[in-house]
Amino acid sequence: MIDLTGKTSLITGASSGIGSAIARLLHKLGSKVIISGSNEEKLKSLGNALKDNYTIEVCNLANKEECSNLISKTSNLDILVCNAGITSDTLAIRMKDQDFDKVIDINLKANFILNREAIKKMIQKRYGRIINISSIVGIAGNPGQANYCASKAGLIGMTKSLSYEVATRGITVNAVAPGFIKSDMTDKLNEKQREAIVQKIPLGTYGIPEDVAYAVAFLASNNASYITGQTLHVNGGMLMV
């Protein structure tokens, strides 16, 4: 049984979907959770469901100062989960520079800042767990998502590099790469589109946000203390690496 009692976790992109599921599970396992996102109303709704042992931090990851401040004003931090991200999809020949830049800025650069500032705190206590949420497309690629795929592949490379740098300080840095997870986006697909995707998944179904949350909880726990620099794939066998 995973026990996170006494730990403090910061989860970005916590207002819905995978981020919300991660926050709920870490809270259930005993951790105090700092839930962060750009939608204050959704964060409040999540807070009402959690009832206690939580803090809300509204943060715009496009603002680098806000990224740094999000960590600096956290008095105690044991677990960082970088889940927030955006998409801006189109074929590369139609993709404007600003469409590429904004995805990289939020999905990669902002997460680098969060990792860097968290490490500064974790080094002082010689303990920390960092989990960066990547994606199946960060490994496999996907047409129309050159910017998003680059950002998610970059997260994996960054995770490996940082894990080397902090391994002797009691800090582990890992990534989780979800596949097709049931969400508002997948709900908008028609039956033919859903069936085409499911046929590519050996387990024959979409994942759910809780599937990703349990992977994160494991990596955040002492049960995973000998695991660092790794990417845990949660994709129903859609990609085997």
Swiss-Prot record:
Enzyme Commission numbers on file: 1.1.1.100
GO BP annotation list: fatty acid elongation
Keyword Oxidoreductase attached: yes
Chain residues that bind NADP(+): G13, A14, S15, S16, S38, E57, V58, N83, Y148, C149, A150, S151, K152, I181
UniProt keyword list: Fatty acid biosynthesis, Fatty acid metabolism, Lipid biosynthesis, Lipid metabolism, NADP, Oxidoreductase
Keyword Cytoplasm: no
UniProt xrefs under InterPro entries: 3oxo_ACP_reduc, NAD(P)-bd_dom_sf, Sc_DH/Rdtase_CS, SDR, SDR_fam
Binding-site residues for substrate, renumbered to this chain: S135
Protein's name in the database: 3-oxoacyl-[acyl-carrier-protein] reductase FabG
Species for this entry: Rickettsia prowazekii (strain Madrid E)
